[in-house]
Amino acid sequence: MSRYFYDLHVHSCLSPCGDDDMTPANIAGMASLKGLGIVALTDHNSAKNCPAFFTACERCGIIPVAGMELTTSEDVHLVCLFPDLSSAAEFEREIARRRPPVRNRPEIFGRQLIMDAEDGITGEEENLLLNAADITLECGKALCESFGGAAYPAHIDRESNGIIAVLGDFPPDTHYAYELADKDSAEEYAARFPHIANLQKIVSSDAHYLWNISEPESFFELEGDSADAVRRSLISHILHGAEAGR
């Protein structure tokens, strides 16, 4: 096994709330400077910048993970991670059919830029990505897993779109992993919700600016002699709740 410092929740300039400097190449470069080994790109309800992100990360020696931050019909944010680009693209096609056809207003919400790995703009998503998709939390998780991925509630320690803030509880009969935005909140949430003690905990940044990307603090111990194998190991740990790191 090898140790990989990670950040599994990063937004690019495709997310309207993401800074325009959050290009795939800039994210990969900053993650490399910080010493991260695995980084997931998780834009709101879209994975269209993941191909450019893969190319940029591979140049920097980082293992990229294709992902999405899905907004469910309950208005809960769900991190969805995939073993490869094709799985993420298929999942996105399913989600795109469930997104409301509301046009983005860049002057209000921000631009939604689709990039190549050289920081070139190749397009712009016209429909607003922030709105909830017509898919429930449970169905979103199941759909993600049907494409070989893993899904878990994002930033449960935040008021905005966190599962606890929205639903009033962390469902006790589920086998979700869960994400914290602040590692120092772990004890508080374990005390409030004892049933999460045996679930896989993930600490990630939800970065919308380059300086928000995680420092090399949280890590997984993962198997694999290739990027594909390491991604499969990561998803297996998340799905099965293994205590993979800290």
Per-range role (PLM):
Residues P83-E125, G168:
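Active-site gating loops and adjacent loop-to-helix segments of metal-dependent hydrolytic enzymes
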